[in-house]
Amino acid sequence: MDEKIRINKYLSEAGICSRREADRMIEEGRITVNGKKAESGQKVSLEDEVCADNIPVHKNEKKVLLLFNKPRGIVCSTKQQFDETTVTDYLDYPLRVYPVGRLDKESQGLLLLTNEGDLVNKIMRAGNYHEKEYFVTVNKPVDSEFVRRMSKGVPVLDTVTRPCRVVQTGECSFRIILTQGLNRQIRRMCRYLGYEVQKLKRLRIMNLTLDGIREGEYREITAQEWEELNHLLETAAIMRMKELVQKLDRAAKAYYQQDTEIISNREYDQMYDELQALEKETGTVLANSPTVSVGYEAVDQLPKE
């Protein structure tokens, strides 16, 4: 009998959607297992008949990553609402793919689409410092003070944006490189400083660019790009692991010294679980990782599965 796995992971590996989106589809009653509505946390195997929106789900053999030059007016959703054109309807790709992240309806430029859920998780994982580059035109002239304040960080959505690189390219235009992806971040940053975005185009995500892709067209990732992307993702994962180890170490010391609690137990558990997942993904355990004391061998490298 085939090994059973959680249904959100099954759907992710089948290229239907990310695990988070799978959980949402399950809650909405859009997923069935052997004719019955799926339940959150349910486990399935290849012997089960899984359907998404009444369409049978099969594991993908070919893994795909598309680079799409999205025009304005296309929504980054796999579910059509009203008379909007979704990115999947627009592409009409022979395999079922879904967007990696978002690019709002009014924005244009590089959008990645894939049928590999784990890749989505790696790219979108919070805390990974993946570069994304944009060209932006605003409604009035920018100056050195605007560039300075945008670069330093702007208060939006109950936080302050990370420092970023901003270069003025024209009287009313600039390029910006972000390492985070808050909702409508650039538009909110500009609005805070008294500007309105008139054009927003994403030019690059990590090593992947729009070069050679006309608006409305797409191409598959090349073998060389795959190799470079995997290297960047692994490097980013290691950086995130180091950050997590430092935070967990500070929290543990504060606890044993009966100091002020710097994070809640829930936050500690979430970071610990993320660290374990990254260790499994990369096959690496840092020498000072707190997971070493709970069954891991204290080595720098572990065999990858």
Question: Where are these predicted regions, by residue range?
Answer:
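Basic, flexible Lys/Arg- and Gly-enriched helix-loop patches that mediate nucleic-acid binding at interfaces
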Residues: M1-A236
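Phosphate/adenylate-binding "loop-and-lid" substructures adjacent to NTP/NAD/dNTP-binding pockets
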Residues: A237-E305
